[in-house]
Amino acid sequence: MLVDNLEALTEQVAAANKGSRSLTIVGGGTKMFLGNPPLENAEEISVRRHCGIVDYHPEELVIRARAGTPIAELKQVLDKEGQILAFDPPDHGGSATLGGVVATGLSGSRRPYGGAVKDFVLGVGMILHDGAYCEFGGQVMKNVAGYDVSRLVCGSFGTLGILADVSLKVLPKPETEITLVFEVSLAEAKKQLEALTRQVSPLSASCFVDGSLKIRLSGGQVSVQSSKSVLGGEEISSDYWNLLDTHSIEPFLGSDEVWRLSTFSEEPFDDDEFAVCDWAFAQRWLINPASNPREGYQGAGHWTRFKGGNHSIDCEAFEPLSSVELALHKRIKKVFDPNGLFNPQRLYRDL
């Protein structure tokens, strides 16, 4: 259902700006655990009722929808046309929204093989600090477009403005898709994934947890079945990947504190150092660590406190910025949100 709530949203923003009131932006509410906690005295503004698909051209592989549109609805519409969101956005039981996925920059299991959210955002419509609605980007992919605002807002956690609508590039749905499981050691899993990565294979997801390597093969029927016959393994449901991406499986269930390390696939680590590794070992997960894992870590990569629970470890959710990086962030924030209206401190406590 197409619902236009833009006027009400712009009026609320303009009034909050005039009254110097901070705003906490919400959609489906499925990602409020990410980032630093919202300010307790901030006024809530919801984009959930600003929803629906505005424009869809299957033949052009482009869809435009309002920020409150459920990801589940988008997937359903695309599936009827044999198309997908290639960055595998986590579904969170049908409550996750398009705006939340783009604002948090949250990609799923296909990320290292298909691309990130920002790679598929063509354009956005945003509500700025004074209540004005502005559009950035467009509805076509340009090789020489440069680094535009539509990419800048991906992963900005709503700190630059409120996403009202988004244009996305979509891709054809693979003809077939299977998930295979192999009971192997960490060393064997690394070796097998390295071999698959070097080959022209239909690999579209990978995960190592508790002595088990899981991979997803996506593509043409002949290619996928040929790879399966060579690799072997036990076949399971491909629903596994959304359960993984939403942390709806062990060992994530019941966890209070979850940390993510984003690093290089080749970065070495010990057998029992991480509970889960996916994205071809480029994304690694720690569960309920006794202390801040950033302290004393000498390897490459960035740590994120992905799920804080009781926030027993008092620190920034995201990797601390250098003084130069923080200064750049502040300059960008000052241009888009000079009065500090949108989601203050959600990304960093100094923003």
Locate predicted features.
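Short beta-strand
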Residues: 24-25, 204-210, 275-279
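N-terminal glycine-rich flavin-associated loop
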Residues: 1-25, 47-93, 106-137, 174-184
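Helix N-cap motif at beta-to-alpha junctions
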Residues: 185-188, 217-224, 264-267, 288-293
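Glycine-rich beta-strand-to-loop/alpha-helix junction loops that act as flexible
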Residues: 26-30
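Conserved glycine-rich FAD pyrophosphate-binding loop
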Residues: 4, 35, 40, 48, ...
